[in-house]
Design a protein with these regions (language model features):
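N-terminal transmembrane-helix/juxtamembrane module of multi-pass inner/ER membrane proteins
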Residues: 3-44, 84-97
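Membrane-interface loops
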Residues: 12-15, 48-49, 55-135, 206
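Alpha-helical transmembrane segments of multi-pass membrane proteins, especially transporters
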Residues: 19, 67-72, 167-171
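Hydrophobic, membrane-inserted alpha-helices
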Residues: 31, 47-54, 149-153
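Residue-level signal for helical boundary/lining positions with a hydrophobic bias
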Residues: 36-37, 83, 105, 162
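Short hydrophobic alpha-helical membrane-embedded segments
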Residues: 41-47, 142-146
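Membrane-embedded catalytic cores of phosphoryl/pyrophosphoryl-handling enzymes
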Residues: 95-208
Length: 208
């Protein structure tokens, strides 16, 4: 009985939230949300990771490069393993895009895009601090990138390919993943190397 009640509660929650989000659909808004959700597609993410990793490598910021790339690879692997563990099927109705073949929970778009946005924001903020720019600009950077990451998650509900609990699960995974990894990274590399002359880079440790 307890399991059945819990399943009913989750189903009701998913139906209520999905209905509310999808009630916002309009012919004008739909193409924009579809474009937004496509930013989290594997091809888009791979291209962005390659570009950012290449830039960090070009600047010879190997510690930042390994931290950024390793974080995302680890997160992708974790999400895919969890999908195979839970084997929850995706929604089949009210779809605006093709239904992916993979399992539904947790949402890879929600988890990985939020992780990537937070990591990019962190790297940008460390660069800003190296140039002693305002705290207000740092706060704005966090707000913008977190909003983008969350918006991609919500877009998955909007286009109908994920349950709301999938998205919430993805966000929870992102937060659980980011807290220890960022804490460790900042403890190992407390000062940013962005903006420093090349000769000064040797003063800072790099990952083996």
């Amino acid at each position: 009985m307890c399991i059945r009640d819990r399943a009913d509660w989750v189903a009701e929650f998913n139906a209520t939230i999905a209905g509310s989000v999808q009630s916002l659909r309009t012919n004008e808004l739909n193409p924009w949300v579809i474009m937004l959700t496509s930013l989290g597609n594997p091809t888009s993410v791979i291209i962005m990771v390659i570009l950012i990793a290449s830039l960090l490598g070009f600047l010879r910021h190997w510690d930042d490069d390994i931290f950024f790339t390793g974080n995302l690879i680890g997160a992708v692997v974790l999400v895919q393993v969890l999908k195979l563990c839970y084997t929850i099927e995706r929604p089949t109705e009210n779809l605006l895009i093709a239904r992916p073949e993979s399992f539904s929970f947790p949402s890879a778009h929600s988890a990985c895009c939020l992780i990537m946005c937070c990591l990019v924001a962190l790297l940008i903020i460390r660069a800003l601090r190296a140039h002693q720019l305002s705290v207000g600009l740092e706060v704005l950077t966090w707000i913008v990138f977190i909003a983008i990451g969350l918006s991609i998650g919500i877009s998955r509900i909007y286009v109908g390919v994920h349950w709301p609990t999938d998205v919430l699960g993805g966000w929870l995974i992102a937060a659980t993943w980011l807290f220890p990894t960022i804490t460790w990274y900042l403890s190992q590399y407390p000062r940013s190397r962005f903006g420093l002359p090349h000769a000064q880079h040797e003063e800072y440790p790099v990952l083996p």
